[in-house]
Amino acid sequence: KEDVINYIEENDKLPEFTVKSPTGEELHSDDLSGNTTLLVFFVTTCGDCKRELPKIDSVWNEMKDHPTFRLVTISRGKTTEVVNAFWKEQNFTMPFYLDPNEKVFSLFANSTIPRVYLVNRENIVTWMAVEQMSLSAKQLIGKIEQIM
């Protein structure tokens, strides 16, 4: 098994990337400046993702109306149809973006998901979790609010 390499760590600036929503709307990493962003990479078939994503959806439901909060949930390597079906099955309301060729993911790491990054207004990663978050949705909201 190859060693996990984190290309982006705490205190690093977000790399430049662009992702598309299922409707084709582009989001560029520069668009996140000035906001507090929770960035999440997942795959619909990953057990750890299935455990962590409901927490992320809870955070979204609690924080979505905050004007400077952004949630960028990125599906690694799956089609819109696959993610839509998974979202429906899980009753998620949070938005998602697609990384069909894993190009964006490869800027952050070579393997291991889910990955959760908390990013401040200057687009600097202030906290990250790989595989397991070990935080409840409420604790994660606390972390987000601390840096807003």
Kindly give the residue locations of the regions a language model identified:
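N-proximal helix/coil linker or "cap" segments that precede and/or mark the start of modular domains
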Residues: 1-16, 33
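A short beta-strand-turn-helix
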Residues: 17-37
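Short pre-active-site segment immediately N-terminal to redox-active cysteine/selenocysteine motifs
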Residues: 35-37, 42-45, 112
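Hydrophobic beta-strand anchors of alpha/beta hydrolase catalytic cores
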Residues: 38-39, 71, 116
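Conserved redox-active cysteine motifs that mediate thiol-disulfide chemistry
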Residues: 41-58
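Thiol-based oxidoreductase modules, predominantly thioredoxin-like and allied folds used
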Residues: 67-80, 92-102
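Short, internal strand/loop/helix patches
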Residues: 84-121
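Thiol-/selenol-based redox modules, centered on thioredoxin-like
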Residues: 118-148
